[in-house]
């Protein structure tokens, strides 16, 4: 009998199964305390001040691009080689994606190609740390400063990656991560936004859940029901406690798993 290799088979152990079972038995499986704990732990791991857990990296990118509130038709430079969601998120935010070629050796966006694509309408840059290899941040940060661009990092491939002493996802205004089933840290589906800008995090968290001022955990916890308002026209991009339960256990193993791959 031939051995069948499953696509994207994640490394799930008894710890994850036990954590999910405990969550299900708790009676609270939606967005709640485990999501908050996962956000805090991931921010600490990444050495970022703030984190917002969401339903996917696509959701993270869309929320980040939506948050920067550019004018319709403004241009956002993006690498020519990336997954479709990087570009789709730009389009869904009302902006125009401008493709810049990648370096043939690193497969990351080429800083020289970025400068060639800059126009009067260019307002932001989305980079992708492809296959876990960090982009040339020294050159990219010079370009960002020179042209006053907003930088967003697509870190779907680079949970463990660092450039110098800084983790990928902490250089720009936002860092967007994926916990899809094929990634090094999985929650089945899921993502995370990192940011060091406190004033940006609250609105993003609200927009990720319909624009509501309080999520269900805050409305129905042991302190009793509390009124909520719809602050913004938001989306349905929140993470659940079941996903966070898996993520918390996966995060504990990430350094050990990295050593095995090395």
Give residue ranges: language-model regions:
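Active-site phosphate-binding strand-loop segment of PLP-dependent enzymes
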Residues: 105-187, 192-200
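Hydrophobic/aromatic ligand-binding patch that stacks against planar heteroaromatic rings
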Residues: 88-90, 143, 242
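Generic structural signal for small/hydrophobic residues in well-ordered secondary structure
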Residues: 20, 42, 60, 76, ...
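Active-site region of PLP-dependent enzymes
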Residues: 158-164, 171-262
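Phosphate-binding glycine-rich loop
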Residues: 28-75, 89-93, 99-101, 166
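N-terminal "arm"/small-domain region of PLP-dependent enzymes with the aminotransferase-like
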Residues: 1-29, 33, 229-231
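Structural detector of well-ordered beta-strand residues that form the stable sheet scaffold
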Residues: 52, 77, 98, 150-152, ...
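Conserved coil-to-alpha-helix start sites within the AMP-binding
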Residues: 82-87
């Amino acid at each position: 009998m031939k051995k069948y290799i499953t696509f994207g088979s994640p490394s799930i152990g008894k710890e994850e199964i036990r954590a999910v079972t405990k969550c299900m038995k708790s009676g609270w499986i939606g967005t709640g305390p485990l999501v908050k704990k996962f956000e805090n732990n991931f921010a600490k791991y990444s050495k970022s001040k703030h984190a917002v857990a969401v339903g996917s990296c696509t959701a993270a990118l869309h929320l980040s691009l939506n948050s920067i509130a550019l004018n319709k038709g403004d241009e956002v430079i993006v690498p020519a080689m990336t997954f479709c969601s990087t570009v789709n998120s730009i389009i869904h935010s009302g902006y125009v994606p401008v493709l810049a070629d990648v370096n043939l050796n690193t497969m990351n966006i080429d800083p020289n190609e970025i400068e060639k694509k800059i126009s009067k309408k260019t307002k932001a840059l989305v980079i992708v740390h492809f296959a876990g290899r960090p982009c040339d941040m020294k050159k990219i940060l010079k370009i960002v400063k020179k042209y006053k661009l907003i930088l967003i990092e697509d870190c779907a491939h680079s949970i463990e990656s660092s450039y110098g002493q800084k983790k990928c996802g902490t250089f720009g205004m936002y860092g967007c991560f994926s916990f899809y089933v094929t990634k090094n840290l999985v929650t089945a589906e899921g993502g995370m936004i990192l940011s060091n800008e406190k004033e940006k995090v609250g609105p993003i968290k609200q927009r990720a859940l319909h624009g509501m001022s309080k999520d269900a955990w805050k409305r129905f916890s042991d302190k009793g029901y509390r009124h909520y308002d719809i602050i913004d026209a938001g989306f349905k991009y929140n993470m659940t406690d079941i996903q966070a339960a898996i993520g918390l256990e996966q995060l504990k193993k990430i350094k050990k798993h990295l050593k095995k791959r090395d």
